[in-house]
């Protein structure tokens, strides 16, 4: 009898684990669907304009004078993020600069407009159920984040003032094409050695897009996760051809897609070349990163894929070839 029970347990436990993982994927898809609906609803109410940080150098939008002094696009968006936190939480979020907020914090613009969440920060449902540490940050008071840094539960990135924003982190990134310029001398590009970061310069300008800027909305990704947390047996970087994950498309739909089925993408610094693509290294950069598939410290070379779509918002990620000229 004991042997039979042990056999049943050995059979049922893996199935139970798979069922729980499948349930977490359903929750993730529901969260992304909520994000896609909010993204589309915002555009409908804003006469076509997309939700993204919009402040520019020289703007005087904040009631706090220190948040009106930025001299570049990056810092203007930092000021806007700090302003949102102060207004929505009545907490004096310290000013910070030098961080590209458009990657993991753009949902705050939707929250500020009442399109997602319940009028409070942090917003529930913007962290993947499999993304362990941001879930911890969301439950941590901003002034206590440094204790998580010390215990290697939060990254030592940016200033202490910036790290107070981590409770508002989202697993789901808005692709650069939605908020960066198309002009090679004003756009951003991928850091070659750090998969997390973008390279930007003194001439970098961030822009605001419209919903009708998408030439192929059902084929263009807008929100993605840097990692496949649900489909592969082990968490893997999104750009590996074997990875797959739920993605939010510009038409508001959420679909699970395989990276190998996506187009290769482009190099935004060389947009006229049909052969140039964004190529960079994936390697372990922070405490919770999965190892590269090669198992080496050097890491693996990957393509940008739907993170760096050819022709930006005018391009195609899935279900068709890359246009040979800008649509």
Residue ranges with predicted function:
Residues 1-33:
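Amphipathic alpha-helical segments typified by the pilin-like N-terminal helix
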Residues 29, 34-327:
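Short, well-structured segments within or immediately adjacent to enzyme catalytic domains
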């Amino acid at each position: 009898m004991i042997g039979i029970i042990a056999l049943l347990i050995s059979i049922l436990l893996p199935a139970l684990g798979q069922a729980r993982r499948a349930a977490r994927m359903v929750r993730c898809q529901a969260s992304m669907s909520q994000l896609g609906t909010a993204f589309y609803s915002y555009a409908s109410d804003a006469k076509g304009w997309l939700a993204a940080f919009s402040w520019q150098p020289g703007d005087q939008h904040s009631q706090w004078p220190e948040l009106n002094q930025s001299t570049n696009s990056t810092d203007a968006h930092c000021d806007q993020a700090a302003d949102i936190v102060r207004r929505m939480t009545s907490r004096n979020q310290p000013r910070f600069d030098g961080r590209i907020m458009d990657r993991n914090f753009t949902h705050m613009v939707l929250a500020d407009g009442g399109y997602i969440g319940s009028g409070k920060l942090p917003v529930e449902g913007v962290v993947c159920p499999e993304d362990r540490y941001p879930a911890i940050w969301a439950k941590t008071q901003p002034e206590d984040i440094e204790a998580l840094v010390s215990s290697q539960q939060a990254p030592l990135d940016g200033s202490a003032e910036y790290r107070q924003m981590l409770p508002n982190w989202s697993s789901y990134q808005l692709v650069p094409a939605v908020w960066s310029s198309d002009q090679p001398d004003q756009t951003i590009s991928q850091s070659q050695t750090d998969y997390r970061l973008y390279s930007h310069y003194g001439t970098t300008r961030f822009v605001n897009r419209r919903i009708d800027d998408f030439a192929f909305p059902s084929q263009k990704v807008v929100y993605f996760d840097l990692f496949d947390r649900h489909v592969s047996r082990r968490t893997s970087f999104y750009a590996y051809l074997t990875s797959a994950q739920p993605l939010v498309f510009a038409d508001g739909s959420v679909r699970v897609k395989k990276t190998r089925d996506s187009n290769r993408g482009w190099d935004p610094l060389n947009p006229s070349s049909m052969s140039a693509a964004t190529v960079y290294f994936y390697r372990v950069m922070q405490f919770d990163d999965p190892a590269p598939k090669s198992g080496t410290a050097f890491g693996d070379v990957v393509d940008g894929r739907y993170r760096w779509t050819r022709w930006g918002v005018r391009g195609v990620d899935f279900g068709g070839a890359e246009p040979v000229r800008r649509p």
